[in-house]
Amino acid sequence: MEKTYNPQDIEQPLYEHWEKQGYFKPNGDESKESFCIMIPPPNVTGSLHMGHAFQQTIMDTMIRYQRMQGKNTLWQVGTDHAGIATQMVVERKIAAEEGKTRHDYGRDAFIDKIWQWKAESGGTITRQMRRLGNSVDWERERFTMDEGLSNAVKEVFVRLYKEDLIYRGKRLVNWDPKLRTAISDLEVENRESKGSMWHIRYPLADGAKTADGKDYLVVATTRPETVLGDTGVAVNPEDPRYKDLIGKFVILPLVNRRIPIVGDEHADMEKGTGCVKITPAHDFNDYEVGKRHALPMINILTFDGDIRESAEVFDTKGEESNVYSSEIPAEFQKLERFAARKAIVAAVDALGLLEEIKPHDLTVPYGDRGGVVIEPMLTDQWYVRADVLAKPAVEAVENGDIQFVPKQYENMYFSWMRDIQDWCISRQLWWGHRIPAWYGNDGNVYVGRTEDEVRQENNLGADVQLRQDEDVLDTWFSSALWTFSTLGWPENTDALRQFHPTSVMVSGFDIIFFWIARMIMMTMHFIKDENGKPQVPFHTVYMTGLIRDDEGQKMSKSKGNVIDPLDMVDGISLPELLEKRTGNMMQPQMAEKIRKRTEKQFPNGIEPHGTDALRFTLAALASTGRDINWDMKRLEGYRNFCNKLWNASRFVLMNTEEQDCGFNGGEMTLSLADRWILAEFNQTVKAYREALDNFRFDIAAGILYEFTWNQFCDWYLELTKPVMTGGSESELRGTRHTLVTVLEGLLRLAHPIIPFITETIWQRVKVICGITADTIMLQPFPEYNAAQVDEAALADTEWLKQAIVAVRNIRAEMNIAPGKPLELLLRGCSEEAVRRVNDNRSFLLNLARLESITVLPADDKGPVSVTKIIDGAELLIPMAGLINKEDELARLAKEVAKIEGEIARIEGKLSNEGFVARAPEAVIAKEREKLDGYAEAKAKLIEQQAVISAL
């Protein structure tokens, strides 16, 4: 085996070999249980980020673990067309390269351009997924706009429409005036902002007066430009100031519209003036108030966010109405919305109706892609009636057919599902699944899978003109069908029969509603088992936290704190990293700050760590459902782990290859250490499997690390040396056999988390064991064997370890050279301790570097010594001739003084109010941690001073 572990040499060739051999495919054995995971489809033209790497590592660990248990295992892979994101990338590209817009191209040519871009860049993410070691079945790869999935989408739309579960209606949506499309709540970013609250007088009509004799109401608003669309003023029905005015009217400033005063809980007596203007066409809360009180809806904005030349007036059903005039004062027509705000405030002020302006902190919704303020907009959109679909989806979680891990996410799911609104599924984009609806000149709407089908079903001749709806479906609509459409639905395929319902869905909690809930609703509506019972899409939902940077900040390009997972695998120089983080920025003014931070964090760039080290780190950080702060030190630690495993394996191979390891018969004697490591290994297998079965990847990683590093490498390999240098034939055979057997089992155990290094080493180890199989991937996963757990061997070895550690600690504390042989005396020994010393003298002499071991008679106190107490005995190391008392005390005094200086420095820092107020919490916590460490070190040194003074 190569002397040093170099992941760059082994990982890619190995993956290509696995893929070529077809090891990722299901085994097709229907007598075995199936296990299936659907990958959350990443954006087809995107690239892999830490969230992907994190979730995919968890999925691959589960898939490899189940595959090794002989299950018929499928990890379904695919990518998402990502409507708005992909369209924007291509729009930006043609603007930059050709100075054109999509309208210059026209719809068909622009869509061709996107398909072209997909062909060019669509391979990036799948290449990166291969680099992670993902054992997905590439032959089944799907794309949300491939032919099969497009047919499934049409099928679902048509069926839901025919069941009256899809309708077209005029409702309020999040409108992005820059992109000119409706967007989902997930694409809205709420930003804190310092704004104003304008207090405007609305004159009361018909001589009405308030309780304190005023002939107007004062209405407070943060959006005076929407005054033109008001159709009511709400007051709280319990408010003594205004309750007598409910049912009366005010005259709306600037347009002189007579609008009613309504009593509604939405008006808060404590907030503002207690009077709230109601603009149902431009505010989500007002829309609901308007529906409750049958207030008309007046839309005053164009799709670009400008004031219209004349308003659109609708009743609460969204039908055109002439209950109010559609006139808009000429001076506001065509004004951009924020210019209109200024003009309207000035006009209200000129009329003497502006009472006051107060500074006000508010939350403003921005489109996360377009970057402009989102406008609630009344538009014609297609909707899914969600309440009907939600009922069975809630029951499936209530009765345990679907379980959330961690369980607390069920509450989040229930709170959304029990208050579900109809789902707006149309988007004003070009890239996506075009809505299968056609309009006749007579205003009729026809829905069908194709135009031909529509004409046939409705007896429409070739002379009848039809035009297809321009809109496309929300990307989440096709993703909601992901678990069954990828398996070949609407055909009744073998894949559906074998792999649906799927086993586990791994997802971030941020899309629990947008994706998880909708998958449950859609699947249960369309997929039934042979008894007609609705099928769930998956049995378990495993929720991950979000990966943040080392300071707990969300990773984003604008913050310049994104770490590309493959840069940790392959390494990246500082100049390349800076270019990556500061090139093509939306906000170039941030570049300098980002450059400084990056130079401080990665002065030499990022070193290569290999995929296995990255995967191990991600698994170790996967604590349930909490956000995770990325830690480069952990990554280094797990790279060191891979090196340690490599070096330990070389030691095993050097001592066993071409040697008699007892696999072909011959007498074998197992030493205490052999029996102990077999017991430890089996206990590890049991705990590790339990952790994986309970989705505790962090605990599993910890168990693997602890056994490999501490028990196998640090203790067992050392404990084999006395046998290797002086054992009998049968002892040598026993120890070699144990070395190889435990290493081979350990490689299988670790394989799901660190696949590359384990396969590479296993290919060498299998030869010694006489295994002829081709790959570790399809080997049986280790099982717990209680017969190998020798309790006596565990107890005796723990005692030996205690004794060896005690001697090593005395060496370290007394500053005695590690190589200097020592004399060990034991005082006050129990019978058990005497037996253990006599049985294991060679281990003790060897590992504790002793020249002699003497058990003192009961009445012998022994010479002046440094002592340690262990189970059933006191260990003494005589100090005569080992140390110079004066020199040692002087050295310790120097050490204490140095530490006291550090303690004073940190205490000074922490008592500085300025530092504590300014420094991030993480920095303060680190300083406190250092302080505790120094205090502990000082206490130990003082203890040593006392011991040496007494000599």
Curated annotation (Swiss-Prot):
Coiled coil: 880-944
Chief location: cytoplasm
Binding site for ATP: 557
Recorded GO MF terms: aminoacyl-tRNA deacylase activity; ATP binding; valine-tRNA ligase activity
Stored PROSITE patterns: AA_TRNA_LIGASE_I
Record's catalysed reaction(s): tRNA(Val) + L-valine + ATP = L-valyl-tRNA(Val) + AMP + diphosphate
Presence of the UniProt keyword Lipid metabolism in the record: no
Motif ('KMSKS' region): 554-558
Keyword terms of this UniProt record: Aminoacyl-tRNA synthetase, ATP-binding, Coiled coil, Cytoplasm, Ligase, Nucleotide-binding, Protein biosynthesis
Task of the protein: Catalyzes the attachment of valine to tRNA(Val). As ValRS can inadvertently accommodate and process structurally similar amino acids such as threonine, to avoid such errors, it has a 'posttransfer' editing activity that hydrolyzes mischarged Thr-tRNA(Val) in a tRNA-dependent manner.
Record's subunit section: Monomer.
HAMAP family referenced in this protein's UniProt entry, alphabetically: Val_tRNA_synth_type1 (MF_02004)
Protein name: Valine--tRNA ligase
Species of origin: Salmonella paratyphi A (strain ATCC 9150 / SARB42)
